[in-house]
């Protein structure tokens, strides 16, 4: 069973995201629970929480089909203590919003060392940040996303993800989300059946499929190994359609949100229908 959808807008309230996902005939969706480019947000009103839960029940979306994403401003590996604390507070708020909405996953980019501390120290800070927030929340899993490795962003190697998981005390509440565009840009080839086999074998050996909690299905405008994060519509970029068909046929990707963040929302419904047809 595959859960397929897109990162839909929550404009007008988080309950509207559910309706937009349903209109795409999606069986999964992602959303921001607050403005992703602001630090602070008003608390979720009780009536909006109720509307969100009612819409999920009405349209058949369980927590395992929904992959909320945190703010882009958060850096859980920030080298400067004051800025690190600000990120940790914001991440806690994001986790608490998920708790309120009855959601069990929160997807986030791990963090950046900003050329001020070494990789290992930054990865340890990220794990420490996760531990602090998991201690203050319950029921929500921290889902680390791999990155393309732009700038000083960590998470572009599977080993980075494994190192963070290793530092998290409650292994039952940490997982990973693999973005195909990011992986490709970071040097993990996905253009053929053979390279898909190799890349996902490596993921299984280094991180473990038991930690896989979601996928972002994106083609890439960026070149292989370029460390540049530029998404494209499925089949229109440098990856091609093989990997997406591969994922839809492989049971290791069952029952997790498979989320489009492709560049043209106007064709999401078509892309979702095409993905479903690959099974």
Curated annotation (Swiss-Prot):
Q: Which SUPFAM superfamilies match?
A: Xylose isomerase-like
Presence of the UniProt keyword Zinc in the record: yes
**Keywords for the protein's UniProt record, in alphabetical order:** DNA damage, DNA repair, Endonuclease, Hydrolase, Metal-binding, Nuclease, Zinc
User: Binding of Zn(2+) 3: at which residues?
Assistant: 182, 229, 231
Give the record's cofactor note, including how many are bound: Binds 3 Zn(2+) ions.
- Cofactor entry: Zn(2+)
**InterPro entries referenced in this protein's UniProt entry, alphabetically:** AP_endonuc_2 (IPR001719), AP_endonuc_F2_Zn_BS (IPR018246), Xyl_isomerase-like_sf (IPR036237), Xyl_isomerase-like_TIM-brl (IPR013022)
What molecular function terms (GO) are annotated for this protein?
A: deoxyribonuclease IV (phage-T4-induced) activity; DNA binding; DNA-(apurinic or apyrimidinic site) endonuclease activity; phosphoric diester hydrolase activity; zinc ion binding
Q: Which residues bind Zn(2+) 2?
A: 145, 179, 216, 261
Name the Pfam families on file: AP_endonuc_2 (PF01261)
Residues reported to bind Zn(2+) 1: 69, 109, 145
- Chemical reaction(s) catalysed: Endonucleolytic cleavage to 5'-phosphooligonucleotide end-products
Query: Mind listing the GO biological process terms from this record?
Result: base-excision repair
Look up the EC number in the record and give it. 3.1.21.2
Summarizing the function annotation, the protein's role is: Endonuclease IV plays a role in DNA repair. It cleaves phosphodiester bonds at apurinic or apyrimidinic (AP) sites, generating a 3'-hydroxyl group and a 5'-terminal sugar phosphate.
Quote the NCBIfam families the UniProt record gives.
Answer: nfo (TIGR00587), PRK01060.1-4 (NF002199)
Task: Give the similarity note.
Answer: Belongs to the AP endonuclease 2 family.
Q: Write down what this protein is called.
A: Probable endonuclease 4
Q: Which organism is it from?
A: Serratia proteamaculans (strain 568)
Organism ancestry: Bacteria, Pseudomonadati, Pseudomonadota, Gammaproteobacteria, Enterobacterales
Q: What gene is this protein translated from?
A: nfo
């Amino acid at each position: 069973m595959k859960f397929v959808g897109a990162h839909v807008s929550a404009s007008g309230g988080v309950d509207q995201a559910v309706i937009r996902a349903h209109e795409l005939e999606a069986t999964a969706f992602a959303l921001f629970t607050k403005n992703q480019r602001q630090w602070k947000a008003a608390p979720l009103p009780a009536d909006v929480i109720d509307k969100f839960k009612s819409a999920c029940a009405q349209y058949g979306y369980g927590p395992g089909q929904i992959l909320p994403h945190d703010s882009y401003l958060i850096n859980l590996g920030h080298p400067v203590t004051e800025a690190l604390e600000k990120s940790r507070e914001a991440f806690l708020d994001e986790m608490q919003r998920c708790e309120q909405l009855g959601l069990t996953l929160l997807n986030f980019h791990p963090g950046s060392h900003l050329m001020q501390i070494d990789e290992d120290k930054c990865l340890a800070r990220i794990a420490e940040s996760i531990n602090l927030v998991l201690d203050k929340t319950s029921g929500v899993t921290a889902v680390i996303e791999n990155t393309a490795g732009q700038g000083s962003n960590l998470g572009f190697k599977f080993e980075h993800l494994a190192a963070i998981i290793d530092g998290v005390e409650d292994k039952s509440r940490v997982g990973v989300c693999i973005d195909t565009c990011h992986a490709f840009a970071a040097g993990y080839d996905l253009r053929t059946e053979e390279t898909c086999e190799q890349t996902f074998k490596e993921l299984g050996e280094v991180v473990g499929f038991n930690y896989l909690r979601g996928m972002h299905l994106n083609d890439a405008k960026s070149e292989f190994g370029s460390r540049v994060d530029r998404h494209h519509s499925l089949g229109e970029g440098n990856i091609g359609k093989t990997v997406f068909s591969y994922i839809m046929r492989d049971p290791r990707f069952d029952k997790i949100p498979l989320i489009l963040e492709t560049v043209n929302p106007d064709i999401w419904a078509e892309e979702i229908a095409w993905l479903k047809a690959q099974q």
